[in-house]
Amino acid sequence: YQQWQDLLLEWITPGEQTPDYWEQFAQKLAALHSNTHEFFGLDFNNYIGRLPQQNSGRVHFSDFYAENRILPLVKLLRDQQHYGQKEAVVFDKLSGFLHTLIPEELPALLHGDLWAGNYLTDGQGQPVLIDPAPYYGHREADIAMMQLFGGFPQQVFTAYHEQLPLITGWQKRVDLFQLYPVLVHAALFGGSYIPQSLSIAKSYT
């Protein structure tokens, strides 16, 4: 039995989306984000894709985003020889600026990998989120991830904002919050994600 590994999952019977599907999606996401915590992070580390995710707790999200998300991946990309010292300096500089770029809010429970491939429609026509990489973070991280690869209509963002308003200026921070998943894709797949991540970092420094 030691040669086998099992994964037991709940079966979700598929169905068709209801007319108010995206409003329901926004309500469920807002309900998820309404679960708050005293620190950013999680009591244990986990994974995003096959990459480890460091979740040690931080009081300020700017510190968490730098030390637990951006810089570990920059180190990995340097180890993979995608980045050199010159590129690393850009990310170090950005990390020092994050406290001026990201507004404070309560740590919210995030899905953590909310792209269009990570939700299903169940037999009642309701949205179901799957395959999370959860931690307590900044809500704008989930919102930005939803916009990275598309697949979500504008009405879901409008409905979310009505349920749980985002902090003023959030649209200007979308690229900043997309930096982490772009770095993840750079480490996993290389290619255009490497210059894209560097371009995002430079745009905020």
Enumerate the predicted regions with their spans.
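Hydrophobic packing residues in well-ordered alpha-helices of helical domains and bundles
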Residues: W22-F25, E87, F91, S197
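An alpha-helical support segment within catalytic cores of ATP-dependent transferases
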Residues: H37-L109
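Generic structural signal for secondary-structure transition and capping sites
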Residues: S34-E38, I70, P103, P165, ...
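C-terminal alpha-helix
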Residues: K28-L32, S199-Y204
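Active-site Asp-x-Gly
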Residues: F61-A66, K75, L106-L109, A116, ...
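Conserved PLP-binding active-site segment of the aspartate aminotransferase-like
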Residues: L8, Y180-A187
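Short, solvent-exposed loop/turn segments at secondary-structure junctions
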Residues: Q2-Q5, I12-G15, W115-A116, A133-Y136, ...
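ATP-binding pocket architecture of kinase catalytic cores
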Residues: Y1-D63
